[in-house]
């Protein structure tokens, strides 16, 4: 799966947790999930679990702690898929 495909899927997953959908229209790899998209930290756990389900990857707590941006999530998923 390409980086672009993974990014699109991650944004699709985020759509269910972001109250203001217009924020996702401008989202890039540098978009901070908690600050820019205004997702609370409890929801970030739900997002990570959903990513595990969708991508068939296991993300441990240390790895999850390093996810701050959309790009961080995409990079981690790419590493897990390799």
Regions found by a protein language model. Give the residues of each.
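Charged interaction scaffolds used for protein-protein
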Residues: 16, 81-82
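Phosphopantetheine carrier-protein modules
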Residues: 18-38, 55-66
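C-terminal structural segments of small proteins and small subunits
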Residues: 65-66, 71-77
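Two-component histidine kinase catalytic core, primarily the HATPase_c
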Residues: 43
């Amino acid at each position: 799966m390409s980086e672009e495909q993974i990014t699109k899927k991650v944004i699709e997953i985020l759509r269910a947790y972001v109250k203001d959908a217009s924020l996702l229209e401008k989202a890039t790899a540098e978009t901070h999930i908690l600050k820019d998209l205004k997702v609370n930290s409890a929801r970030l756990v739900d997002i990570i679990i959903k990513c595990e389900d969708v991508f068939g990857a296991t993300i441990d707590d240390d790895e999850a702690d390093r996810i701050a941006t959309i790009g961080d999530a995409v990079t981690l998923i790419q590493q897990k898929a390799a």
